[in-house]
Amino acid sequence: MLLLARPPKAWHRLFQLQPLALLGTPGGKTQHVRYQLFSTPGPADTGRQGQPQGPGLRTRLLVTALVGAGLGGAWLALRAEKERGRQQQRTEALRQAAVGQGDFSLLDHRGRVRCKADFRGQWVLLYFGFTHCPDICPDELEKLVQVVRQLEAEPGLPPVQPLFITVDPERDTVAAMARYVQDFHPRLLGLTGSAEQIAQVSRSYRVYYSAGPKDEDQDYIVDHSIAIYLLSPDGLFTDYYSRARSAEQITDSVRRHMAAFRSVLR
């Protein structure tokens, strides 16, 4: 007999009957046929050749992601450390250049005498220019105050004092400076003085300037260096930014200098 009966619960597993062997008599006549039951794998199946299944695809992807995140974090930390090292070297090199050494005495746009010591304990962004400048000075001052506003919007950062020193003392009187700075930022201070005082502070910061010839209206252009200076709370020249640097780049640099300064004080 080939198959007498199967328990009802086994029928759902039955999907194929396959002959295993034909057993013959010595005379060559077939005596009977045995069959094996094939079924779908059950919960206890362990895979091919009786070996346990390996980790699933989801597990492998998770492990790969964790390893990648760890390597990425290590690379970013190493990059940040190298950047801090380069910045410290740059800061030391700039300070050794002895830029901004000595004091100055100038009048602000309210007529008050100002010296370098007045800004101790504050971060300062400083620009040299003149009020009759047609385009470059307004653009650079607007960029400077944009940096100040961006830093003001970040909680936990100290305020930055913006300064504007004229290189045209002949025309940039206290009243002229007052009219000019009000268009940029309420905390922007305009500083002016005598020709000798302006020459002294300009030499201190290595600022070149030269007044051009006057036209028939007695108007003239002043050729001068274009740079924004950063002074730390200890009054030291810390960095400078050329016209090619964007407000975002300057903001990021000032932020990093602030972090480095705090780490030294700890």
UniProtKB/Swiss-Prot annotation:
Q: Name one GO molecular function term.
A: copper ion binding
Q: Which family does it belong to?
A: Belongs to the SCO1/2 family.
Name the Pfam families for this protein: SCO1-SenC
Q: How does it assemble?
A: Homodimer. Interacts with COA6. Found in a complex with TMEM177, COX20, COA6, MT-CO2/COX2, COX18 and SCO1. Interacts with TMEM177 in a COX20-dependent manner. Interacts with COX20 in a MT-CO2/COX2- and COX18-dependent manner. Interacts with COX16.
Q: Which residues form the Thioredoxin domain?
A: 85-259
GO terms under biological process: eye development; in utero embryonic development; intracellular copper ion homeostasis; mitochondrial cytochrome c oxidase assembly; muscle system process; respiratory electron transport chain; response to activity
List the residue ranges forming a coiled coil, or say none.
Answer: none
Q: What is this protein called?
A: Protein SCO2 homolog, mitochondrial
Which organism does this record belong to?
A: Bos taurus (Bovine)
Per UniProt, the keywords (alphabetical) are:
Chaperone, Copper, Disulfide bond, Membrane, Metal-binding, Mitochondrion, Mitochondrion inner membrane, Transit peptide, Transmembrane, Transmembrane helix
Major place of residence = mitochondrion
Q: On the Mitochondrial matrix side, which residues?
A: 42-60
Q: Which pairs of positions does the record mark as disulfide bonds?
A: C133-C137
Location(s) in or outside the cell? Mitochondrion inner membrane
Mark out the transit peptide: 1-41
Matching InterPro entries: SCO1/SenC (IPR003782), Synth_of_cyt-c-oxidase_Sco1/2 (IPR017276), Thioredoxin-like_sf (IPR036249), Thioredoxin_domain (IPR013766)
Could you list which ranges are Mitochondrial intermembrane topological domains?
79-266
Task: List the GO cellular component terms.
Answer: mitochondrial inner membrane; myofibril
Q: Which amino acids does the record list as binding Cu cation? A: C133, C137, H224
Q: What does the record say about its membrane topology?
A: Single-pass membrane protein
Return the PROSITE patterns for the record: THIOREDOXIN_2
Summarizing the function annotation, the protein's role is: Copper metallochaperone essential for the synthesis and maturation of cytochrome c oxidase subunit II (MT-CO2/COX2) by facilitating the incorporation of copper into the Cu(A) site of MT-CO2/COX2. Could also act as a thiol-disulfide oxidoreductase to regulate the redox state of the cysteines in SCO1 during maturation of MT-CO2/COX2.
Annotated TM spans: 61-78
